[in-house]
Design a protein with these regions (language model features):
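Long, charged, low-complexity intrinsically disordered regions
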Residues: 1-33, 40, 47, 51, ...
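Short acidic beta-strand-loop surface patches of small beta-rich interaction domains
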Residues: 63-66
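Short, glycine-/small-residue-enriched flexible loop/hinge segments at domain edges that mediate gating
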Residues: 29-32, 55-61
Length: 94
């Protein structure tokens, strides 16, 4: 799998796109950021999700629970704690 750097308007982090098992992933790493940068980048990154086959993956230094309330009913998420203590959150359309 190769990850391609993509431009996402109004973001401050690098976003990468890749395909795996028929799904398109858009990924960013917010572990070096401080609030509100991770939330702002996530909210703009969610605009990339156009179909049931798209996923947005964010890597965070803690679980971003305040962010979940901002998702509304359009998106769902899966949170996975990594061995490093960081969190991998995968967002998709509901």
């Amino acid at each position: 799998m190769s990850k391609e750097l993509i431009q996402v308007p109004m973001t401050t982090l690098d976003f990468f796109q890749y395909t795996q098992e028929g799904l398109t992933y858009y990924e960013f790493n917010a572990t070096e950021c401080s609030p509100p940068e991770p939330m702002v980048n996530t909210m703009h990154g969610l605009n990339l999700i156009k179909s049931q086959n798209d996923r947005l993956v964010g890597i965070f230094f803690h679980e971003p629970t305040p962010l979940y309330a901002k998702l509304g009913s359009r998106f769902s998420y899966d949170a996975q704690e990594l061995e490093s203590g960081d969190f991998r959150i995968t967002f998709k359309l509901t």
